[in-house]
Amino acid sequence: MNEIVNTNDFSKTDAILGPLIPTNFDYLSTKLQVRKIPKVAPLSTNSVALREAVYQSVTSKKFLRKRMYEYLDKTLNREDNIVLVVDSLNRSVEKELLELFPKATVLRPEKSNYLLPDLVDSLLVDSLPNKVILESQDFSLISSASSQMSAQQSALRSVQLFTTYRSNVYENTNLSLKQLGDLKFTYTTDRLPLKLGEYNSFQNHYISLF
C-alpha cells in the first residue's frame, strides 16, 4: 500500500473506493497524499476511523446493534418471557442483553447449531408473551430457531422474534419469509426494502444520467 501511495499522482483523483479491509482502509486514510480526497469504505459492517474526507458506505454493525438495544430497552416488558438464543460467537452480545434483561432465559443451541424441540417447548409459555432474541450469523441455527419458534405459535401461545443484527445470511432463499413474518421478526436495517422493479428518486436519477 505504501508503494501505491508513494508512486502515484493523486492530484487528479476525484475519489478513492477502498481498500476493502477496514484496517487497510484506516491505514490509507492516515496518508497525507490522500487526506483531502474523498475516501469511501465499501461493503464492510466493521467501523472505520472517520477521519477527514472519509465515508463509510455501509452502516456499522456496532451502530445497528446500539439502536436495537435502545429499541428493545424501550419496547420489551421485563415481565414478558424473554428468551435469548445465542451461539458461541456472540457471547459478548449475550452479556449486554442480560444486562438489559437480567431475568431472561438463555437457550443454548446444540454443538451442530440447532435447537432441541422439547427444550424450546419447555421454555416458551402460554401465560405470557414470548419474546425471543436470536443472535447468530449461522444459517443452520437461524433456520432451526425460526422454524421451531413459528411452530410454537398458537391461539394460546404468542411468540415474537428479534435480532440485534440481521446479517446477509437472512437473505438465503431457503429461509421461510412466511415464518419470519408470522413471528413479526424485528431488526434494525440501513436500507428500505423496495418492491421488485421499484426505484427511489436517487436510483431513477442515476439510471437517467448514466
Please describe what each predicted stretch is:
Residues 50-55, 116-120, 168-181:
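Glycine-rich, charge-decorated loop segments at or immediately adjacent to ligand/cofactor-binding or catalytic sites
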Residues 9-21, 40-42, 81-87, 127-145, ...:
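Periplasmic-binding protein-like
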Residues 144-210:
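Extracellular/periplasmic periplasmic-binding protein-like sensory domains
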Residues 42-44, 87, 104-119, 136-137, ...:
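A generic structural motif
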Residues 1-2, 51-54, 83-84, 101-116:
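Short beta-strand elements in bilobed, periplasmic/extracellular small-molecule ligand-binding domains
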Residues 1-7, 65-68, 112-123:
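Structural motif
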Residues 3-4, 27-31, 71, 95-100, ...:
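A short acidic, amphipathic alpha-helical/loop segment
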Residues 17-86, 91-93, 97, 171:
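Extracytoplasmic ligand/sensor domains, especially the bilobed periplasmic-binding protein
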